[in-house]
Design a protein with these regions (language model features):
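Gly/Gly-Pro- and Ser/Thr-rich, intrinsically disordered tail segments characteristic of DNA damage-repair
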Residues: 1-176
Length: 180
């Protein structure tokens, strides 16, 4: 039996994709901005479509209901207030670095309404970046923000490791060339 060639795959899952899009659209860092994507026109029982990583760090799940976010933020703020100078807040912030630097700030967050059309459009642009390097038959799309790519046949062509190829594609996403 012939020896099978070793396969190399790249899995890309865009971190908190909807929340990240909303942060970037606002000129905010997706990793340090407290933001949820949810429809405020519904009740607080509405499920958040996304929660930013910094807000998840406070124990809020990625698919929390809005009332759970409200309740958890109240709990966090009660604890922060106990530890604040004179047990008083001097303001609020949705930015994690500010909250870490100033215990007298209350935890706040942005509620962004969902924009599915925008998320699909950006997902298409991201997919086009992948297509600059990988043929569509080697890209398996799992969801709007997840792909698995078989890059075995491309490593020799590009003279890269799988990690280098992944980083090349990811870096291209951060440049203005991504949508070209």
């Amino acid at each position: 039996m012939p020896k099978q060639k070793r396969r190399y795959c790249i899995a890309i899952d865009l971190k908190s994709y909807f929340a990240s899009v909303e942060c970037v659209e606002r000129g905010l860092d997706p990793l340090t901005t407290n933001l949820v994507v949810a429809d405020l026109s519904r009740t607080e029982k509405a499920i958040c479509l996304a929660v930013s990583p910094s807000l998840k760090a406070y124990g809020i799940s990625g698919r929390a209901r809005l009332f759970e976010v409200v309740e958890r933020v109240k709990q966090v703020n009660a604890e922060r207030q106990r530890n604040a100078p004179r047990r008083q807040f001097v303001g609020r912030s949705h930015l994690d670095p500010e909250l870490k630097a100033n215990p007298a700030l209350a935890l706040d967050y942005i509620v962004a309404p969902p924009r599915m059309g925008k998320y699909r459009q950006l997902s298409t642009e991201i997919y086009r970046v992948y297509l600059k390097y990988i043929a569509p038959e080697d890209i398996h799309v799992y969801s709007i923000d997840e792909v698995m790519m078989d890059v075995t046949n491309y490593l020799e062509i590009y003279h890269m490791t799988a990690r280098e190829l992944a980083m090349t594609m990811i870096c291209l996403l951060y440049t203005s060339d991504a949508a070209d």
